[in-house]
Design a protein with these regions (language model features):
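A short acidic/small-residue loop/turn micro-motif
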Residues: 45-48, 123-124, 164
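Glycine/proline-rich, flexible active-site/cofactor-binding loop segments
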Residues: 93, 99-159
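Acidic, turn/loop-rich segments in luminal/extracellular domains of secretory-pathway
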Residues: 1-75
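N-terminal module-boundary/linker segments of secreted carbohydrate-active enzymes
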Residues: 76-114, 120-123, 247-251, 258-264
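A generic structural motif
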Residues: 71, 120-122, 163
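Domain-level detector of nuclease and nuclease-like folds
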Residues: 148-264
Length: 264
């Protein structure tokens, strides 16, 4: 197993011998050679600790330089399911879940005064109806009205107050499936990610409430013509973020795939 994580390059103009050392929060997990190669002392365990923060110190005994480094571990998945590389594992149903602290929504990542909720409302607005244009608040920070299609219930909505932003893989479902082990920064990104197209979708409040935190073994959209697209989104998210698929979930998804002639 390869334990090295990075190689630090430094030069001294006078040709003096450089000395490397580590400090910070987690130096005991690593070693660094005279050539600047940083490696784990022991094979790390993803579920025990997967974020490490260290300071790299370089000195010629006259001048010293310190550089921070954060090392993240990624979960390795090796199971194959319907063309996706995934993790087969049962849900962790005993791990504590605190949505408000671990997965706060909705952030304003680009500083334009629009939270990510309103970014999604803007991006998913259907601009084909002059009677229902996209209307913002006077300060431009909030979407008030427009036109949105809920593929779960096959319905249109025209007021943003009737529309909710659904995490296709609900936060509690993601948490039980492995997101519980994400570092805090990754939990925050997962809860607010508008860059991964499949993760968030604007739907009616009633369909979102009906779904709750269910996986496909307990809930599917009322609109059966959307089954295949929904399942593909689900699998894309589970694969991309290395979230596990439990046995009941896999069985139902496979049956639905076959019954509806889905293609990935």
């Amino acid at each position: 197993m390869q334990l090295s994580v990075a190689t630090i390059s430094a030069n001294d103009n006078d040709g003096d011998l450089l000395q490397y050392s580590l400090s910070g929060n987690d130096p005991s997990y690593f070693s660094i050679t005279n050539q600047g190669v940083i490696a784990f002392n022991q094979p790390p365990s993803y579920f025990e600790k997967n974020e490490f923060s260290i300071l790299i110190n370089v000195t010629d005994n006259i001048v010293s330089i310190t550089q921070p480094l954060t090392v993240f571990l990624l979960r390795v998945c090796s199971d194959s399911f319907l063309g996706k590389i995934v993790c087969f594992e049962e849900e962790n149903t005993i791990i504590e879940y605190d949505r408000s602290n671990d997965y706060p929504t909705w952030q304003d990542w680009d500083g334009d005064c629009q939270s990510n909720r309103h970014e999604v409302l803007e991006s998913e607005h259907i601009d084909d109806d002059s009677n229902h244009p996209l209307v913002f608040s006077s300060d431009g920070c909030f979407v008030n009205s427009g036109k949105w299609f809920d593929p779960y219930d096959n319905l249109y909505y025209f007021s943003s107050s009737e529309v909710q932003i659904d995490h296709v893989v609900a936060l509690f479902e993601a948490h039980k499936s492995g997101a519980w082990s994400f570092p805090a920064s990754r939990k925050l990104k997962f809860a607010n990610n508008i860059d991964f197209d499949d993760l968030l979708i604007a739907v009616g409040g009633s369909s979102n409430a009906s779904k709750g935190s269910s996986d496909p073994s307990d809930w599917m959209p009322n609109n059966s013509s959307y089954y295949c697209e929904y399942l593909n989104k689900w699998l894309n998210i589970k694969s991309e973020f290395r979230l596990s698929l439990d046995s009941d979930e896999r069985e139902v998804i496979l049956n639905l795939y076959q019954e509806n002639n889905c293609q990935n």
